[in-house]
Design a protein with these regions (language model features):
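Sec-dependent signal peptide cleavage junction
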Residues: 18-50, 57, 83-98
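Short coil/linker segments at helix-helix boundaries
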Residues: 29, 73-130, 134-137, 144, ...
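Structural register within alpha-helical repeat arrays
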Residues: 34-38, 56, 70, 77, ...
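Repeat-mediated protein-protein interaction surfaces in helical alpha-solenoids
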Residues: 46-54, 122-129
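Residue-level recognition of tetratricopeptide repeat
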Residues: 63-66, 136-141
Length: 157
């Protein structure tokens, strides 16, 4: 009885010490695979993606896939679409998302407008700026930044 108690206590002590140690560092491919799986199942701003991106950023701070993932996450998280009533048949180059009739049988147009949370948008821009700094010859990163800025400014191109 005493031997089995000691064996059980020893087993628990070894188990807890193993849990207390940091898990081994994942490779870039493992992070990328996990990120792709989460985005595929939960969308670009799903639960757990921010935590994964933070861990990935600590282990590989200049990884392009991680930086683009952060940009996508924070940009998606910052975007808040809403319907607004506007005069005219087009707004910022877009057709109305919804058209209703008022009491005088006139068309009332509603357009989808994306508003952005300033802090989350700033984090997205910081991520894409870091990606541009790491790989200045990648034009796609510059185009992502330009598109995000145009969207946030609500200017018709």
């Amino acid at each position: 009885m005493k031997k089995s108690f000691i064996a059980a206590a020893l087993f628990l002590a070894v188990s807890f010490s193993a849990l207390a140690q940091d898990s081994p560092k994942m490779s870039r491919d493992e992070y990328a695979g996990r990120y792709e799986m989460l985005v595929k199942r939960l969308g670009p701003e799903g639960v757990g993606i921010e935590t994964l991106l933070q861990k990935w950023g600590k282990d590989y701070p200049e990884d392009m896939d991680m930086l683009l993932g952060k940009f996508t996450y924070y940009l998606s998280k910052s975007r808040k679409p809403e319907l607004v009533q506007k005069e005219g048949s087009r707004y910022l180059g877009n057709a109305p998302a919804l058209t209703l009739k008022d009491s005088l049988d006139r068309d009332v147009n509603y357009f989808q407008v994306d508003n952005y949370d300033g802090e989350l948008f700033r984090q997205a821009i910081e991520a894409i700026d870091k990606a541009i700094e790491v790989s200045p010859l990648r034009l796609d990163c510059r185009l992502y930044k330009i598109s995000a800025l145009i969207g946030a400014e609500k200017e018709s191109p």
